[in-house]
Amino acid sequence: MRLFAQLSWYFRREWRRYLGAVALLVIIAMLQLVPPKVVGIVVDGVTEQHFTTGQILMWIATMVLIAVVVYLLRYVWRVLLFGASYQLAVELREDYYRQLSRQHPEFYLRHRTGDLMARATNDVDRVVFAAGEGVLTLVDSLVMGCAVLIMMSTQISWQLTLFSLLPMPVMAIMIKRNGDALHERFKLAQAAFSSLNDRTQESLTSIRMIKAFGLEDRQSALFAADAEDTGKKNMRVARIDARFDPTIYIAIGMANLLAIGGGSWMVVQGSLTLGQLTSFMMYLGLMIWPMLALAWMFNIVERGSAAYSRIRAMLAEAPVVNDGSEPVPEGRGELDVNIHQFTYPQTDHPALENVNFALKPGQMLGICGPTGSGKSTLLSLIQRHFDVSEGDIRFHDIPLTKLQLDSWRSRLAVVSQTPFLFSDTVANNIALGCPNATQQEIEHVARLASVHDDILRLPQGYDTEVGERGVMLSGGQKQRISIARALLVNAEILILDDALSAVDGRTEHQILHNLRQWGQGRTVIISAHRLSALTEASEIIVMQHGHIAQRGNHDVLAQQSGWYRDMYRYQQLEAALDDAPENREEAVDA
């Protein structure tokens, strides 16, 4: 029953719907008490031979009318009750998605995608079923059960009623024990389903890699193991579930046996008429539904309670980064980074130390360094995926922690290392941040990203569907479409996180030239492994082991002893060797 207490906030808000449904349920329960009474009257009237045919037909017509009214009222309360429960599903999913969208990368490191999807679908469905069918079953069984007991006790015989219901306390104890066991086992079954869902999602999104490495059999075996584990845990739930109905039917059978035995003795003794015993047995038949419903309700509610506890656990997780209260001031501003130290949550080793620089509007910053040196961490801090533990980052001389997240991020356009495209047209992917952009604006940024000609060569040009995650496109095309998408936003700060790694040197040079022209008055931050992408930067910082090892422009660093010069010379030599065969072929042709 704790689920109903946990959902009391919703029941209080939708009290009109639920109260209306409950009122109709009470009316229906009262109407259903009439037919057994009528049957008893008719039986006594027929056995005593004082009923006419007209009287019998009148009572039959009364029962038919009651059946029609009950049918109509059941339709109305179902609309009221289930309409309210479906609205709960909408709100739970909206709250859940809003919570997921507020979370930051650290959250998604701890939670698997398949598990998050299972909570949004399967768990919410269980809660909604409990809020609809569970409430209906609870109210219907209580109202009907109490009404029938009152009629049996007051209108027929309280002694026979008490005698026939002796098995009920044992049944209630068994249902409570089974309900508690069901709650725990269902939580385990839902967790297993989440793992299976996660395995499915991972396998489908990585199907190309699986085929490339010939891992189909291995993945099938892993999936089969997860499916078997899920099946076993659901079977454990089914074993508990299967105990409910036998418990109810044994109790009902015992109650009928006691009622027939005790009632027959009372008829022989003259304290009951045959019609009253017939009515009593019909009332006892009406008790079958409340007893079955009670067991079913425990089943539904315990499943819903286990599911809701999983949803609440997710909704209760506070974001690592808290929203600020101040909007970002209008106009272009200076970005000041002053990081004394930053350490990732649940780790001891600092990821960044003593990183300081200032960027004025119109400047371009290049960031380079070996793998794992802290480049992406620095960009994550600028985007406020995490907050600096010691030091701060300021914009317009205001710490980012004081700025509204939405307001700050609206000033950023980011292209990450792994560009993500939606299963939509090329044009819609470019216009993601500006849905009202014109075709001319879309084509303009595509030209700036040097992808316009590639798009025109696609089957339907800008209207070509790119497939899930852009599966129809090459890596370089996906990167350039992502760059075009960022440029269309026309943000004040553009961040490219190794976003040119999949394009050739000539295309890279053209894109950087276009960015330089486009970026007049804007701040551009480029992180790259290929140093040719940084030659036009106003300043370059070389990251090593989480701190700045070198800084300066390209000309200075190319002459200065250190990582930058060594890597630049190596890449120049590598490029020259790659061009050598082509040069030799041209010489032979000459």
Swiss-Prot record:
Listed SMART domains: AAA (SM00382)
Pfam families found in the cross-reference section: ABC_membrane, ABC_tran
Source organism superkingdom: Bacteria
Protein name: Multidrug resistance-like ATP-binding protein MdlA
Chain ranges of the ABC transmembrane type-1 domain: 18-303
Similarity comment: family membership: Belongs to the ABC transporter superfamily. Drug exporter-2 (TC 3.A.1.117) family.
Organism name: Escherichia coli (strain K12)
Transmembrane segments annotated in the record for this chain: 23-43, 53-73, 134-154, 155-175, 248-268, 280-300
